[in-house]
């Protein structure tokens, strides 16, 4: 299958090239960029060898359609919407790594992404409704038949995977869910930003986006769908002075306070028994971001505080892989009829 990587020189694009360049099931048939168009891949990234198709082209719907069956859109929020309809009309399937199609309502996207909405005058509510949310653990059948897939954000991925087994079975209350997440700086993208300068974020830990972080509404949308009830939760992200990795600690109230840590671990393990990239750790073993770095795995742990009937869920992912591009490749595999983790059998070179 021929794959176009659009936005090839951002972190999402770089990871996509790395994951697909040696995969015999796919051919990277097109590399597209804005600022880097007209340059060679090897000039930008001499340490990542491509045997062919070394030129980064100007982004063009016609060129993508001529050369690719599927387009991975690794672009800033808002830009994907300027390409998607044209690509779909020409028969190109789209896997979008931005937030443009994560919401079922265009109006909601416009409210949450108001700055982008002011810049990009969208009129594609029909595509928002059509897009399939690309979390394979809950949508693998719909993903396999989709022509437009919206890859989840990194924070929602790290929060929803541990929550879904308990929300879907009504094991935890819909109220009082708290998500405390920490991310490496690569989650902010490759564009320069003062807060991501080493002298600004090094040797420090800081929260940001309290109450109104964009991923709050994304998590709430999917959590509400899974539980069948409207859910409002508290989500606080933090910036860690490391390059890649994400750690989420999630708190909830058990409806049956008699459940133990072992009971809840079994619930997690049974729910994800068919997903080899999801590892449920033994009780009292708590995951480290270092364990999943450079892999598409997610490690989960659970502990119950029987004094107050609370459950504590822990998850770690590599924010650039399971939190972004690795998940996009899982979606690509599903629409290609291939095993979910094809090409994602990566080894963590610990330490």
Curated annotation (Swiss-Prot):
Taxonomy, superkingdom: Bacteria
Keyword set, alphabetical order: Amino-acid biosynthesis, Arginine biosynthesis, Cytoplasm, NADP, Oxidoreductase
Gene3D superfamilies: Dihydrodipicolinate Reductase, domain 2, NAD(P)-binding Rossmann-like Domain
Pfam families: Semialdhyde_dh, Semialdhyde_dhC_1
Entry-linked InterPro entries: AGPR_AS (IPR023013), AGPR_type-1 (IPR000706), NAD(P)-bd_dom_sf (IPR036291), NAGSA_dehydrogenase (IPR050085), Semialdehyde_DH_NAD-bd (IPR000534)
Reaction it catalyzes: N-acetyl-L-glutamate 5-semialdehyde + phosphate + NADP(+) = N-acetyl-L-glutamyl 5-phosphate + NADPH + H(+)
Major subcellular site: cytoplasm
GO cellular component: cytoplasm
Molecular function as annotated in GO: N-acetyl-gamma-glutamyl-phosphate reductase activity; NAD binding; NADP+ binding
HAMAP family associated with the record: ArgC_type1 (MF_00150)
Family stated for the protein in its record: Belongs to the NAGSA dehydrogenase family. Type 1 subfamily.
Protein name: N-acetyl-gamma-glutamyl-phosphate reductase
Organism listed in the record: Prochlorococcus marinus (strain MIT 9515)
